Amino acid sequence: MALNLKITYRPARKADMPQLHNLIVELATFEKEPHAVCINPKQMQQWGFQKQPYFKAWVAICQKKIIGMAVYYFAYSTWTGPAVYLEDLWVVEAFRRKGVGKALFEKVRRAGLQKKCIRMSWQVLHWNQPAIDFYTAL
């Protein structure tokens, strides 16, 4: 990968769902659970772009290709109030350690702040040391 490739960030669009679905399958494969992905791009288009969408996403783009994603949704706790939950954060291997994951994480954090969320939550598999190191360094 050339060092001067420009990476841009924007909210995901309905037309992005096939590429996002591919990244979700890539993530699930990494997590040793490719069989667990039961949704398809058409369902993602429906559920993510209806009047009250079930999820939102930010994408990282390089040369017109989505190279990273952050999928999230808003939740509510009767104890603590509104929250944003980061469901998936994934960057294709060639673009890791270049600030893409951090930028996507920050986009979700800011979305939570705009909605007056009290907290941001996510989960990491106990064996995924690179992800644990990534989140610890934030």
Protein language model features and the residues they cover:
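C-terminal structural segments of small proteins and small subunits
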Residues: 123, 133-138
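Conserved GNAT acetyl-CoA-binding A-motif
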Residues: 112-124
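Short glycine/proline-centered loop/turn elements that form peptide/ligand docking sites
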Residues: 105, 128-131
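Acetyl-CoA-dependent GNAT
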Residues: 2-7, 11-18, 22-81, 105, ...
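Conserved acetyl-CoA-binding loop-helix of GNAT-fold acetyltransferases
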Residues: 91, 97-110, 136-137
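A conserved beta-turn-beta hairpin within the catalytic core of GNAT-like acetyltransferases
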Residues: 76-86, 96, 116-118
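Residue-level recognition of the GNAT/N-acetyltransferase active site
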Residues: 92, 125
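Structural motif
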Residues: 67, 115, 137-138
